[in-house]
Amino acid sequence: MFSGASAINLDTKGRIAIPKRYREPLHACHNSQLVITVDIQSSCLLLYPIQEWEKVAAKLALLSDTQPTERAIKRMLLGYAHECELDGNGRMLLPTPLRQYANLDKRAMLVGQLNKFELWDEAAWQQQIEQSRLAILNEDLAANERLADFSL
């Protein structure tokens, strides 16, 4: 399971280096294979270990091609999906269309989300964090059934 936010850089070829603490689990459990796609609700990328992506793909296969929203979701997630493997230095190339979608240039944030990672432009990540903080402050957590008993 992946957690934590790491500041990373894109090199001139559009590659990122996955932080060392994630490399061994990715290699041992997933043979260093990932699938990168877009987040349909935010301007970031989603990086799934291959076994986790297979679960997502199975759910996508159940969506209807005759329902416009379901078809659009399939089109976005599958159309942008790119399989990759970490090289010996833990690097992976981000295809240009994916970099453009997430406005990635030089500085990025890799954010663990248990079964996957999010990859954000650093400035967009900072903005998202502030928006999330304000949304949580303005929410009546007790009114949300799943959050009513949530305690840290």
Swiss-Prot record:
Residues 5-52, 81-124 form the SpoVT-AbrB domain. Its main location: cytoplasm. Keywords: Cytoplasm, DNA-binding, Repeat, Transcription, Transcription regulation. PANTHER family: TRANSCRIPTIONAL REGULATOR MRAZ. Belongs to the MraZ family. Forms oligomers. It is found in: Cytoplasm, Nucleoid. InterPro entries: MraZ, MraZ_C, MraZ_dom, MraZ_N, MraZ_sf, SpoVT-AbrB_dom, SpoVT-AbrB_sf. One of its GO terms (biological process) is negative regulation of DNA-templated transcription initiation. This is Transcriptional regulator MraZ. The keyword DNA-binding applies. Gene3D superfamilies: Transcriptional regulator MraZ domain. PROSITE patterns: SPOVT_ABRB (PS51740). Pfam families: MraZ (PF02381). GO terms for cellular component: cytoplasm; nucleoid. GO terms for molecular function: DNA-binding transcription factor activity; transcription cis-regulatory region binding.
